[in-house]
């Protein structure tokens, strides 16, 4: 028979022979807790069979003196149905102007189904790829991706783990900007608090552990976030395959796009992806950092494009983002140098357009866009670019 201390580090037990009661003590870090408000996948309900639709309609008419009149009609429908656990979604528009009979267009039309075992969604039809790592592409095909809404609320966005060791039965208090945002009693031993629900990219966290003997330990946990950062242990995948469906392009292209993100620890998130097509490929690697001086993300993309006329373009694109909340002045500071790209860098959309012999306006000339955002607690927002 195993002793609790042999199986669980810092665990223990007491046995009261008078009442034949055995009390076990297991550190909070080793307890598999379900976040309040979260429903386990095996208890999910796919909903009832139903149809829905919503619409927006506008009618414009103008009468000009000595120059006739003009009239236009615009209608947009968002419709779909839920049947046997599958959902269909359609986004369609109707546009009619003077001298035309009107035209119906479908922006998206796809069938999807949630896959609880993968915490993801399978989607097939006319849709768009993710824009988190590569530029979004409209296409016809299939997409399988991690649906973050299937995760507990605290894991859908980046929040740090708060970890420590309690010497006795202790009270852990976490404050942000002077407000208590979390409080929990923990037994002796290691603890790990992962179910924080905080304002995105907010201020650093002040942690206080009050022991049963009255002693107090305090420390600071840095907290700032930028896009693509994930909580430690959380991963995000996205797979798309199909044929581009770019409006106005006669020559489309088959492609496959894969991306993956993983929260390694409180400090580091890793992410990357690839886009593969006939005569085109692109690869991205990036990191997100949560540090005492703020959150920083850096990524680099290398792309190769060979056009139908034989022209070859090899280029690079770099992206940096920064975010920091200054508690002393109650000011949020954000800096983004978005997409510095070399002259020969081509996105997949550029590649398709070039093969349609359509001139790309301002085609990927070397550029840097610098955006600085400063927002104070008074709601005053300053933007410099």
What is each residue range found by the language model?
Residues 2-233, 288-290, 299-366:
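Outer-membrane beta-barrel channel domains
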Residues 75-79, 254-260, 287, 382-384:
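Structured alpha-helical segments in the cores of large, soluble enzyme domains
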């Amino acid at each position: 028979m195993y002793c609790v201390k042999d199986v669980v580090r810092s665990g223990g037990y007491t046995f009261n022979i008078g009442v034949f009661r055995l009390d076990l003590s297991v550190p909070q870090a080793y307890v598999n807790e379900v976040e309040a408000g979260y429903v386990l996948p095996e208890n999910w309900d796919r909903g009832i069979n139903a149809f829905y639709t919503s619409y927006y309609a506008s009618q414009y008419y103008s009468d000009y003196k000595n120059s006739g009149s003009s009239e236009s009609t615009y209608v947009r429908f968002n419709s779909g149905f839920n049947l046997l656990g599958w959902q269909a979604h359609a986004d369609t528009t109707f546009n009619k102007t003077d001298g035309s009979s009107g035209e119906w267009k479908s922006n998206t039309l796809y069938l999807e189904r949630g896959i609880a075992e993968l915490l993801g969604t399978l989607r097939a039809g006319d849709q768009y790829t993710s824009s988190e790592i590569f530029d979004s592409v409209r296409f016809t095909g299939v997409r399988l991706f991690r649906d973050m809404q299937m995760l507990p609320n605290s894991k859908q966005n980046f929040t740090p783990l708060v970890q420590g060791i309690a010497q006795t039965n202790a009270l852990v208090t976490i404050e942000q900007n002077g407000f208590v945002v979390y409080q929990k009693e923990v037994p002796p031993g290691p603890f790990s608090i992962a179910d924080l629900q905080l304002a995105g990219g907010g201020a650093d966290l002040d942690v206080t552990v009050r022991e049963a003997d009255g002693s107090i330990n305090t420390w600071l946990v840095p907290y700032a976030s930028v896009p693509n950062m994930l909580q430690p242990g959380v991963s995000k995948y996205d797979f798309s395959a199909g044929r581009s469906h770019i409006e106005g392009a006669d020559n489309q292209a088959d492609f496959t796009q894969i991306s993956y993100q993983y929260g390694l620890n409180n400090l580091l998130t890793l992410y990357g992806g690839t886009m593969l097509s006939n005569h085109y490929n692109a690869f991205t690697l990036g990191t997100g950092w949560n540090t005492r001086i703020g959150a920083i993300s850096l990524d680099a993309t290398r792309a190769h494009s060979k056009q139908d006329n034989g022209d070859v373009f090899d280029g690079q694109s770099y992206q940096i983002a920064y975010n920091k909340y200054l508690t002393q002045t109650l000011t949020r500071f954000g800096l983004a140098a978005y997409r510095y790209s070399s002259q020969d860098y081509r996105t997949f959309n550029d590649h398709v357009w070039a093969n349609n012999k359509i001139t790309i306006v301002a085609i990927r000339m070397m550029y840097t866009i610098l955006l600085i955002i400063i927002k104070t607690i008074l709601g005053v927002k300053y933007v410099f670019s």
